């Protein structure tokens, strides 16, 4: 399916429901593109994916959506000026419907691999007609009905009522029969005009059969039994052996999609017919062109699947069927379909075989003259399309990188609000129930006095990298890190009723992770952290312009910080509010140890508790509760890490210089000692590294 139809569906959704709904439809359907190139082929099922996704998002019935989208098709075509072709397709509405197949043939110049539907009319009267619609695609009936209603109003100011008569499925085709009820004022006007002609003048206009077959060199005359009675002089030169044979065994009917029978042809005489020889035209040993026929019933579908190169081996004719009452036969008046002169030469045809009175000679010569120009233009257009696709891919990649940076600075839900044009003030929100965790490293200042600045950076980098991995799976969000302080919240920006439980699970894992870190250069013997937790209400929002940050405001932040300051090494100190919240939601989940009250401010005290242990399995947060700083909606290659590092150049970045300096000195470096542990040793030291020490807290949290 070409992008013209897909782009029409996308345009309708955007104009009817808005960009936000279109974004939801893309997400539900798994589509990533915003625009669709008109002449590019897409998956056959993509249109149905978009329609069903729109149904899921908006709740509108699928049939109603298809009808409304079809109704907007004529307006959509005005962007590409295809509406100008529709205006001249027929003088009346029935003529327009009969000319739709011809329109699709015209569109093959723009869409060479087009698989169009077929339309033909019968039982026309003053009150309407019966329309047959055949297509290899299913599910577009309401789409076509919407097109018919809209075009009848736009071009012919006629109201049409569509009555569905029958639906059949045969040979991978969907055959729909509809009765179109409308006021057909032009019915029989043309026949009346012909009957008013002077009969005496018509009697004087006579023509012999020899002249007739000379004027139409590729005519085929066959009787009711489908046997070929005579052929034109041009066809006689290349297919002399077909006279007396059945036309439906000598040729295959490509268009329209009907059975190759006398009755069917009589019903569809207003349609363009395309025939293709059932066997290829070949040359004998003497170089004389001969035609071989067999009685093998070859499927027409095989010809439809053939490529242009394979079809050139067969003779294709396109024309119209006329019933000759005097001969009691049907005349097929057509011309060969030749894409270029070499094909005509291989078929044994020459320019003088074509009629003088029509433009067939001019078309063949003009096609050759324009072939080089068209090929050049097509090559240039193809190159432009490739460049556009490459630019679009680069744009998408840069957009993903920008999103990745944004999601590292702000929560994904808040960042998406800002991207959609909302102000920073509009992103501010009050959260009545959140739980905040503060941690810091015990005697961090004393540690820094024995380490170089680069060692301090590497030390914090390893610790916080492991902490970041923990929070991604615990339904919490890292607000900020200042020095050795690490602040985490649960319940904002994504609300959850298990915020206290998620925070305590995360804090417990922090202690276990810190206890597994040792140092081998005798500067740091062990790493202890302390943690403080408090629950309450906060106001959250984005602060700053040049460097926007997601910040929390309120007394809850202050109290949580006080909990951390009054905690003990490798301990989690929680406030009475958090303690009560855990006990109310899930009694006995955690074992607590009561501690003395601590002063908060202005002689205000609060009861505190140490977390001793946990009982039962950990609760797994839902994906929507995990506000990661990474955008995991897109998968990218490793080279996307260039987003956070300077481009490769002759000058080294400060980060790479610092890492090299550490390697040369052979000082502090951290590597995992187990699935979650850290081992520190000197890479350049000749001493064998000691076994890592288990520095889990003495009263471990299980």
From Swiss-Prot:
Cofactor binding note: Binds 1 or 2 heme groups per heterodimer.
Pfam families: Guanylate_cyc, HNOB, HNOBA
GO biological process, one term: nitric oxide-cGMP-mediated signaling
PROSITE patterns, per the entry: GUANYLATE_CYCLASE_1, GUANYLATE_CYCLASE_2
This enzyme's EC code(s): 4.6.1.2
Composition skew (Acidic residues), residue ranges: 633-643
SUPFAM superfamilies on file: Ligand-binding domain in the NO signalling and Golgi transport, Nucleotide cyclase
Protein name (record): Soluble guanylate cyclase gcy-31
Gene for this chain: gcy-31
